[in-house]
From Swiss-Prot:
NCBIfam families, per the entry: S18
Disulphide bridges, residue numbers: none
Gene: rpsR
Keywords, in A-Z order: Ribonucleoprotein, Ribosomal protein, RNA-binding, rRNA-binding
Name of this chain's protein: Small ribosomal subunit protein bS18
GO cellular component: cytosolic small ribosomal subunit
Protein family membership: Belongs to the bacterial ribosomal protein bS18 family.
């Protein structure tokens, strides 16, 4: 049996949206922006999935944690039974 040919998958390089748009600022009070980086369960989405650079991912984590602490974001997602 001949080996199966490998399919070439084209993966698009993710660009950090904060590096691309210099006017977009990471702020713990801006809940609309922070919700894009938090999963339905309330977990912070990793940078390999979101596509942010390392420095902005660190800033995002700090902002999400601050927003959680002052109750702008929930610690866990909405519990739907």
């Amino acid at each position: 049996m001949a080996p199966r040919p490998q399919k070439k998958l084209f993966t698009r390089k993710k660009v950090c949206r904060f590096c691309a748009d210099k006017e977009l600022v990471i702020d713990y009070k801006d809940v609309k922006v922070l919700r894009n980086f938090v999963s339905e369960r309330g977990k912070i989405i990793p940078r390999r999935i979101v596509g942010t650079c390392a420095s902005h991912q660190r800033q995002l984590c700090e902002a999400v944690k601050r927003a959680r602490q002052i109750a702008l974001l929930p610690y866990s997602g909405s519990a739907q039974n």
